[in-house]
Amino acid sequence: MKNRNGFSLVELLLVVAVILIISAIAIPNFLRSRERANEASAVASMRLINTAAVTYSVTYSNLGYPVSLTAMGGASPCTASSAQACLLDDVLAQGTKSGYSFALTGDGLVPSVSYLVTGTPQAVGSTGQRMFCTDQNSVIHYDSSGSGCTSASPTLD
């Protein structure tokens, strides 16, 4: 019998099978972790938007709450004005962050007395499972049914 170096085909197939089994277990857990991280980031962004909206309404009391996210943003270096208040980073002010799309809708009044912010996963099941919303009361609600988030939706604990 010859003295051969290396692995046999059976040994290589066993190693590949073990790697595939480990991958089948690890990858779904990784994806769920990423979804949870995106949802946590979305909730933090909603809180930041609420804080910025209140600051905006106090600073520009003649206008009330902002009419859009871009009104609270501004590229760095930023000079504050009612059209670009420099309260949010430019990424969030453009409406996307961590796999979520954000939108702020004002009430159309001057001064504005209410607003609604929504945070929607860009790819449901991949970037997040739940939609979030909040308004001038700063209570964050969520919807995981896909029917849309409203002030009647469950609140976060």
Where are these regions (language model features)?
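N-terminal single-pass transmembrane signal-anchor helix
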Residues: 2-30
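Extracellular/periplasmic head regions of type IV pilus-like filament subunits
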Residues: 51-130, 134-139, 144, 155-157
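A short acidic/small-residue loop/turn micro-motif
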Residues: 146-150
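Alpha-helical interaction segments
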Residues: 19-21, 46, 90-92
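N-terminal hydrophobic or amphipathic segments with adjacent small-residue motifs
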Residues: 11-18, 36, 113, 132
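A short, glycine- and basic residue-enriched loop/turn
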Residues: 4, 19, 34-37, 53
